[in-house]
């Protein structure tokens, strides 16, 4: 058992009465998700000793971290990435989004299943499979997971030059990413694919975690609600940053609906250069507008893949302009 003087979280937790028994697995996560089991803080702390000072006993006699503390969440992510994905160096600016890794991993695994559904239920793997991550951020989460699990090659784009500088450091310090993740800056804040997608480039899929909110005020209000649920009554002067995330990561004009609608419109110009376009959709109420946009551009096939993590339900929408015959030709050329 881990120990550190003068008193450690494990010792404090072990003395608590009425210790609550938690299920061994988290409900709803994808079967291949490495994070289905509850966090093993012993193992994580061995992989990343920097996590130890952030461990604390809970009211139920368990061990956890304070999820309202951005430094604790950041260190937990660092430990998870090192322990499960072999990432030796990972750091993000203080004001960058620190995403929940189990949920991000679910998106990658369900996307792999989507590709497999067009390939005789065999997941296409290796560097020949190219994905475009819109809004890669400083954290590089999707490329890290996709490369480790399936050997995929990624291009990551972002409008934030500071985020890309941090991402470039992550790439340079991890050999597995050097030849599998290329970073590009989107210099037009109103464009999504235009300017970062060359005429001759082909992608097997795109993925995106779009800005959720329609304004900075809306983003701040959501963060205050999260803090309240976690029992944190104090509201910081800049509440948006408590959970991480710059303006471009958290909100944009039109919010999630506006961003994904623009993505749908831009995807028409790349119709024959991509098999599946996809985007996370956090709000179920966003779906009707996205379906309407997809009907307008005459997408050949549209799928909605639901995901769950405990009581939280999310989904991503996928669309393609390829006919069944074109899909078969794509698979034969690129995935065989």
UniProtKB/Swiss-Prot annotation:
EC number(s) per entry: 2.1.1.181
One GO MF term: 23S rRNA (adenine(1618)-N(6))-methyltransferase activity
Record keywords, A-Z: Cytoplasm, Methyltransferase, rRNA processing, S-adenosyl-L-methionine, Transferase
Pfam family, any one: Methyltransf_10
Cellular location(s): Cytoplasm
GO BP of this protein: rRNA base methylation
Job of this protein: Specifically methylates the adenine in position 1618 of 23S rRNA.
Protein name in UniProt: Ribosomal RNA large subunit methyltransferase F
Organism, as annotated: Yersinia pestis bv. Antiqua (strain Angola)
